[in-house]
UniProtKB/Swiss-Prot annotation:
Listed PANTHER family: HYDROXYACYLGLUTATHIONE HYDROLASE (PTHR43705), HYDROXYACYLGLUTATHIONE HYDROLASE GLOB (PTHR43705:SF1)
Subunit structure: Monomer.
Protein's UniProt name: Hydroxyacylglutathione hydrolase
Binding-site residues, Zn(2+) 2: D61, H62, D134, H172
Enzyme class: hydrolase
Single GO MF annotation: metal ion binding
Amino acid sequence: MKPLELDVFLCRTDNFGVLVHDPETGFTAAIDAPEEAPILEAATRRGWKITHIFTTHHHTDHVAANLALKEQFGCEIIGPINEAIAIPGLDRTMADGDSFLFGDHTVKVIETPGHTAGHICYHFVDDKLLFAADTLFALGCGRLFERPAADMWHSLQKLAVLPDETAVYFGHEYTLSNARFALTVDPDNERLKSRAAEIEALRAEGKFTVPTTLGLEKETNPFLRAADPAIRRHLIMEGKTNEEVFAEIRKRKDNF
C-alpha cells in the first residue's frame, strides 16, 4: 500500500486547508472546505481531483466551500451525524466509533464535543494521522461554544490515548499565541520552553507549525495536562478535579 500524500496550505486568514491523496485509487479528500480558491489551487497544482470532503464541524470557516467544490467535482461530503442539518451538501453521516475505508486506508471517527456539539475528528489508523480540526491545536484547544469544559476535557482524553507518534493536523495557525499562553500556566516546563522558542523561530520565517505529534502535545500542551502536579501548583488548584483545572486554563486562555 502506497503512503498517503498530503498538501497543507492556508485558507481565509489562519485556517489550514489540507488535501489527502491516495495514489493507488486517485482519491483526494479535503479535510474541511474553508475557502474555494486555495483548495482549487492546491488541487490543480498537484493534479488531483477532489473526490471527498471530510467535514469536522458546522462552522462557516470549515464548510464555506462545500457546495462549490461539490458542484465542480461531484465529491462526496462526509460529516458528523449530530450536526447534519447544518452542513451544506452532506451525503453521509458519521457517529462516534464509526469507521470507513478511503481506498485501502481505514479511517475511524472520534466524536469530540466541546468546540461544537457534534465535532468529529478523523483518525487514519494505520497511517497514524489525526485530523483534529478545532478540538486539539498545537499547544491549544478550541474555544467552547456549544459544550461545557468538562465535555471538552473528556473529548481530549479520547484523543490522548492514541499512539504518541500520531501526526496531528489541526484547523488553525494559532500556535504562536498558544505557546505564549502555555508558558503562563506551565512556566517551569523545560520542554515547553524549548518548543516555544522553536515556534517563535518558525513563525518569524513564515513557516507553518503543522503537524504536531500527540506525544509532543502530551508533554507541552496545558490543555492535555490538567492532571499535572506542576500546573496544579502554579494555579493553586491542587485539590480540584481535572475538569475544574481544565476549565480554569480554558478561561485564562479566553482572556489572554
